[in-house]
């Protein structure tokens, strides 16, 4: 079997591999992931590794220092800094959703939401992108 015989077999694999690259899939599957570069102190646990890991209307995107399921119908604008490790996880953070400034608050919980960041500086960089 020469090169011409192998080509029809290889073309579908080449095309599928190209579509699965993040840059190509984003254009096909809807809105692209936010392109916000931030320097984080601690690696975060990924919520997802591929789009099917996320609930309907959400997309698996690199966000802050891990991969998160993001809902593009919402604006991500809440920040936090970790106060205590592990259990119970109490966080301090702020919101700019209404006032468009970061204000501190303390909350506890095991998972929180996608609107959280390790420092106020990271929050401000991220939130500035959306306002």
UniProtKB/Swiss-Prot annotation:
It holds the Pfam family Kunitz_BPTI. One of its GO terms (molecular function) is serine-type endopeptidase inhibitor activity. The keyword Cytoplasm does not apply. It comes from the Eukaryota. SMART domains: KU. SUPFAM superfamilies: BPTI-like (SSF57362), Elafin-like (SSF57256). This is WAP four-disulfide core domain protein 6. It comes from Homo sapiens.
């Amino acid at each position: 079997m020469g090169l011409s015989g192998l080509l029809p077999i290889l073309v579908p694999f080449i095309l599928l591999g190209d579509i699965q690259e993040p840059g190509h899939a984003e254009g096909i599957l809807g809105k692209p992931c936010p392109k916000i570069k931030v320097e984080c102190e601690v690696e975060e646990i990924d919520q997802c590794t591929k789009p099917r890991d996320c609930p309907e209307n959400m997309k698996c995107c690199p966000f802050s220092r891990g991969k998160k399921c993001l809902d593009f119908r919402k604006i991500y604008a809440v920040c936090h800094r970790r106060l205590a490790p592990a259990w119970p996880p109490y966080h301090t953070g702020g919101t700019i959703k209404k006032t468009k400034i970061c204000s501190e608050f303390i909350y506890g919980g095991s998972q929180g939401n996608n609107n959280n960041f390790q420092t106020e500086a990271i929050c401000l960089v991220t939130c500035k992108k959306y306002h």
